[in-house]
């Protein structure tokens, strides 16, 4: 398996996975993720508390940071983070031989799940299970020399949309830049200056700065 080979060559590799509620069943990929302790559930996360819903859309709500391991270079953690139209994730195990998992992001306690492949009418839908549900999971494989390879799985591909990355109302761009800075061990980190502070502008919008960080990460093993 090419993904196994990529992550098992003892060179500190990282794989990022973003789930989507419109994607087809991917049995081989999902089986691979489960070997790393990550399960992708066939449902969508939906918020039941109107106070936490964004733009009157129950699939669009705020997200809680559960683990700060990848958020060290965020400039402002008070700005809300969102994982819209997300599939819930689950940890298959916490530790299995040389692989360990940890939850990075969670939905609120008032979220529920609805099968994403159904034509269910929300007006007739009744929640059967409540959160929090995992929305991001980090899985690490440790080698004898102390190096690690890792998978970071996210339940929402929409969280990377241009509108969210360029929005000053959400910290998605700040969060993902911190993730990439941390995973690539950057000493001179890329950061997004808060819009509430003065200072000289660089002539790049948030999405463009994010793409610089993304390109750098892809180029580094």
Where are these regions (language model features)?
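Acidic, S/T/G-rich, low-cysteine, solvent-exposed domains in lumenal/extracellular/periplasmic regions
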Residues: 1-188
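Selective detector of the "anchor" transmembrane alpha-helix that sits immediately C-terminal
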Residues: 8, 209-221
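Noncatalytic linker/hinge segments flanking ATPase motor cores
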Residues: 55-63, 191-201, 221
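Short, aromatic-rich amphipathic segments at membrane interfaces
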Residues: 159, 164-166, 190-214
């Amino acid at each position: 398996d090419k993904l196994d080979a990529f992550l098992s060559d003892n060179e500190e590799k990282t794989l990022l996975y973003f789930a989507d509620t419109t994607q087809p069943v991917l049995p081989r990929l999902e089986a691979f993720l489960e070997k790393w302790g990550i399960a992708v559930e066939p449902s969508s996360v939906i918020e039941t508390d109107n106070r936490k819903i964004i733009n009157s859309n129950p699939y669009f709500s705020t997200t809680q940071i559960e683990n700060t391991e990848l958020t060290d270079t965020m400039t402002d953690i008070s700005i809300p983070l969102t994982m819209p139209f997300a599939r819930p994730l689950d940890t298959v195990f916490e530790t299995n031989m040389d692989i360990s998992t940890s939850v990075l992001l969670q939905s609120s306690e008032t979220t529920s799940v609805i099968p994403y492949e159904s034509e269910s009418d929300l007006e007739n839908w009744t929640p059967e299970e409540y959160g929090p549900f995992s929305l991001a999971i980090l899985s690490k494989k440790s080698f004898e020399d102390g190096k690690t390879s890792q998978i970071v799985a996210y339940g929402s591909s929409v969280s990377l949309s241009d509108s969210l990355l360029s929005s000053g109302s959400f910290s998605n761009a700040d969060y993902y830049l911190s993730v990439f800075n941390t995973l690539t061990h950057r000493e001179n980190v890329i950061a997004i200056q808060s819009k509430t502070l003065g200072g000289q502008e660089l002539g790049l919008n948030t999405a463009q700065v994010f793409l610089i960080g993304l390109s750098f990460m892809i180029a580094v093993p």
